[in-house]
């Protein structure tokens, strides 16, 4: 279940399933059942208020309320609007509800131990205001538990944006597949625990819809990993050139360590001659070369991948060097100063991209490079990737990776420990190392983000950037052993 569906794709999955012979009211009953199952798994019987909106999300609420009442729970049900105005499957399930129906209001939250939010689904298109906003505020300030159905009311399912105000849930139960808004900020913060439950929509139906966005997971990229064979040697595993600055040497040293731990066969740090003693003393396995040898280095096709930017410095010299590297059409990772150096002329950078390239901006760098690209993070990453013909990775708690052809992945990892100096340099090194080993740019970016986050999750509080590369071998071993079992 790692595909991510837009709201329109989810509507299409529902439609195809109904056309295939599964009645809509059965899908709604199934939805009510899986939410009921999640509720009784998390809570014992208590006073619950089920808050229903005027659409299918409200119909789910009637199904949930009936199941809870049948199990002896004390249930109050509030409805937005008149029950006579409900249509289709929602009206069918409302007719099966034998309890009282109250007007939707903040009073329903008072005295409740649990609130089930079925007010609005993922397709909400307008800001919540007025009395409904007061209701949401009351829910969020109440000590009761909160379950949201589909998405927390007020969250845009496609973008994660909060439309006015939004319910802050302890548990969100969605159906079939997650939506972008479950993983993109700030919506992700409103969801609490996310449960994705099957309601009878087949995998074949999802395949036919052809999603182009996924939760970043090894299933997405594991087939693209180039594991070394017994007959291989270090030159088969790539030779990465990491370009380092003369003063902020720590950044490129982190790049180098991460790239080598990712499995690259050889690594050379290229820097001003004055800085080479620092780089040479950092790790005996690192090779070094002076910047004066640039032409000879890049004319050697065995040097098949480049990382430039971390600690390198911003300016015309950096711009010129990046353009020369891009002209070679080899695997290239551009980060930090390599991106900022083009802030005044981003079109030159985009025009120069020809080979497999990954751009790894954080939000500030992205805004400087693409000031005219607005919208949610997923939309912006896709637009920038298409414009530049490169894989674009916008870093953050909800990292998004997008390819020029529109494919995208969202990181669902919860790893606040990555907010530390140097972690971005490590990520650039991991991605560069994977590309040097032959992985395509989109897969390398996705795998790099996953390894980076998984390492941080395993290490936990107290993490510093230097810790991340040292944890990579254990994770890579897990992936390798899993690949052997599948073979």
Indicate where each model-derived feature is located.
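Tryptophan-rich substrate-binding surfaces of secreted polymer-degrading and adhesive proteins
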Residues: 80-84, 100-101
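Contiguous, small/hydrophobic- and glycine-enriched helical/loop subdomains that border
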Residues: 97
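Core alpha/beta nucleotide-donor-binding catalytic domains of modification enzymes
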Residues: 87-94
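Short acidic low-complexity segments
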Residues: 100-111, 290-299
């Amino acid at each position: 279940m790692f595909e991510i569906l837009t709201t329109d794709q989810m509507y299409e999955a529902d439609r195809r399933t109904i056309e295939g012979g599964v009645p809509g009211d059965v899908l709604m009953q199934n939805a009510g059942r899986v939410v009921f199952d999640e509720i009784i798994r998390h809570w014992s019987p208590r006073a619950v208020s089920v808050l229903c909106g005027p659409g299918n999300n409200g119909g789910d609420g009637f199904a949930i309320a009936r199941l809870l009442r049948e199990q002896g729970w004390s249930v109050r049900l509030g409805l937005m609007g008149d029950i006579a105005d409900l249509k289709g499957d929602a009206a069918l399930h409302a007719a099966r509800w034998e309890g009282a129906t109250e007007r939707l209001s903040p009073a329903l939250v008072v005295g409740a131990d649990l609130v089930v939010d079925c007010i609005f689904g993922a397709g909400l298109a307008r800001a919540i205001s007025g009395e409904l906003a007061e209701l949401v505020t009351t829910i969020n300030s109440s000590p009761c538990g909160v379950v949201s159905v589909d998405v927390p009311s007020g969250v845009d399912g496609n973008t994660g944006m909060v439309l006015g105000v939004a319910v802050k849930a302890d548990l969100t139960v969605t159906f079939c597949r997650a939506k972008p808004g479950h993983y993109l900020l700030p919506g992700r913060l409103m969801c609490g625990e996310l449960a994705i439950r099957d309601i009878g929509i087949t995998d074949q139906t999802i395949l036919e819809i052809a999603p182009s966005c996924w939760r970043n997971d090894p299933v997405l990229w594991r087939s693209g990993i180039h594991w070394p064979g017994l007959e291989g040697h270090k030159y088969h595993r790539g030779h990465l050139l990491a370009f380092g600055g003369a003063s902020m040497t720590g950044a490129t040293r982190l790049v180098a360590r991460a790239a080598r731990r990712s499995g690259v066969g050889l690594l050379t740090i290229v820097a001003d001659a004055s800085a080479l003693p620092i780089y040479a003393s950092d790790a005996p396995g690192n090779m070094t070369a002076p910047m004066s040898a640039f032409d000879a280095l890049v004319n050697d096709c065995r040097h098949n991948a480049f990382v430039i930017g971390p600690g390198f410095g911003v300016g015309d010299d950096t711009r010129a060097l990046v353009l020369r590297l891009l002209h070679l059409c080899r695997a290239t990772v551009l980060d930090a100063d390599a991106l900022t150096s083009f802030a005044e002329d981003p079109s030159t950078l985009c025009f120069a991209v020809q080979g497999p390239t990954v751009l790894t901006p954080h939000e500030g760098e992205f805004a400087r490079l693409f000031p005219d690209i607005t919208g949610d993070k997923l939309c912006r990453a896709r637009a920038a990737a298409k414009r530049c013909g490169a894989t674009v990775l916008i870093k953050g708690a909800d990292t998004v990776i997008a390819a020029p052809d529109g494919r995208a992945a969202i990181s669902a990892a919860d790893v606040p420990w990555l907010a530390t100096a140097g972690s971005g340099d490590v990520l650039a090194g991991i991605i560069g190392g994977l590309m040097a080993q032959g992985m395509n740019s989109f897969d390398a970016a996705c795998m790099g983000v996953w390894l980076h986050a998984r390492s941080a999750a395993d290490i936990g509080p107290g993490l510093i950037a230097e810790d991340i590369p040292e944890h990579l071998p254990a994770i890579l071993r897990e992936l390798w052993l899993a690949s052997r079992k599948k073979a």
